[in-house]
């Protein structure tokens, strides 16, 4: 073949150990001419103290740490995900490769050949071996590894058999270039690396061959050049102008170890090339030359294979990706550098393999269109405590590129904030209740004073004027009317139906601050809007019917309208037989989008729930002011299957309390009480999942297995509280001490204990 000297590879002066000369593609517009090496760098500053030695085991070992092309691009997480570039063919159009080097053993494609002569698979000049080393040097525990260390190299030697023209890197036959590019296309290359450029233009045949390659879906990585100019070399720009719309070109610029643009690197420019320009390490890249020597080399010649290796990792890990998608991923996940957005220096930014491997765009469960979050798919409620849903090895999700990932759904579930029952119990100090009666009607309003101590009324609830609203806030109210001697009706706003039921029955228990009545809670903080109660006596037994409508209080949702709704309807029988009192009740709780206050995304279950509670209480007057009490609640919750993933589920819950109290313990009018209580807890249950656990890229179908999503905790909160009350000095003195084990039904939580002293003046 005729040597015309139009192509110039990136480095001819970097074939000795720790070489300092620059290497890269060129600029200009003449037949294949060598690109001059960059000027030598200024003397380096004094070196910093050596870093600590890298870990000795695993993928993050000394060999990886020495592979600065990979480390600078943050490749470790891709390796940890199993990506190696295996079975991905990268064509290196260069000066050949030394096939005897162990760095490439078993991974040189049989179609590799000398396109410029008949020398066999050899590399007399070293540039091709060094470029190939950056891409795919073996991970063998010696020196360094390539970015895609299991990729296959299709080596296409276009080097001049006579060597480079003296004093230049003019080493290629122009007529060999289109032949080599066509061979890459016809032999199944996924990526073509071209670490060369030109000064005065390439023949039309070369550009036509490149266009045929990208039209076949092959990624083409080209060096920007080493002239330090404001634009990439003309070979790269002409290719982008001819076929850039295919989205398969990347122009590789160089950064140094400090992630700054290399002084010798041609920049992105302000033209069409900037959108295709990506930087990667191009100074001091560790690799091997054609003799097997360990060398450090400079030039955009080595930025290009770093990016080619990244593309090979993506292609091997995600076989569904097209070449254009791989290029788009590399460009859109680059770290922004220089001016915000695409700029004239760094173009799209700095290569970041870790980001390219992260899910991009909207994520959905494989086999469905159900959206799934990577971080927040719900919040378990208090009764679920430390429940650990069994999702096995995780669920398969697809990102916006239909790439399959394993997501541990359990790790995307949060917990409701831990309750602070003592703080909540004593916060009632700034409340007072005002009541008025007229005949058979009684009206009561609970007032919370403002910070200045003056009473204040919430205008949106009571529809008062602005001045009245400034002074007081009514937080709850009730109107009770006795319809007949045996029948009473009550209405409430911002007051629970449980409280209405107690008031209708004439019983009130507020001795305990922490171990509160477990029958009053359904597993979440209710925000009652309205409530109604009707009580009717039938001989010695009374029937109470109540209804409540409200919103589930959820952390982070400040506006009440955003909170999920619930309805709670109850039927209770209570009576007295001698010294004993009893009650039996049933309640139906309907939640619009929550499950006992737990919030789940649509991929799990956001269709709400239905819960039936059965309650029983009994108290016995033991005489001498001594009274015993026991209460038990059992709940059954059903959850509809609202997605293709979730089938119907059920929960079984329970709560209980045992009290012992004595009036007149130490003085007339005092009372000492002790309670043991378990808040509502999921005893068993969850829902069944038809979970995607595998994915076949060939058929684009997931493999499903049945998994159980457990919502029962391992922890069990038990509250112990002692309370003492005494009328004193025109007021009331209350002393409380408590212990909570496994707070929030979380076994790992430390026990919570405390005490409170309160003195309340009678108003």
Segments from the language model and where they lie:
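Protease zymogen maturation seam
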Residues: 24-87, 102-103
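Subtilisin-like serine protease catalytic core
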Residues: 51-56, 76-90, 95-111, 118-173, ...
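C-terminal subdomain of the subtilisin-like protease fold in secreted/lumenal serine endopeptidases
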Residues: 59-70, 74, 182, 189-193, ...
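Extracellular S/T/G-rich loop segment that most often corresponds to the catalytic His/Ser-adjacent loop
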Residues: 94, 102, 239-312, 316
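Hydrolase catalytic cores
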Residues: 134-135, 156-159, 190, 281-348
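Outer membrane beta-barrel transmembrane domains
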Residues: 508-524, 544, 559-563, 570, ...
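Outer-membrane beta-barrel "beta-signal"
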Residues: 660, 671, 750-763
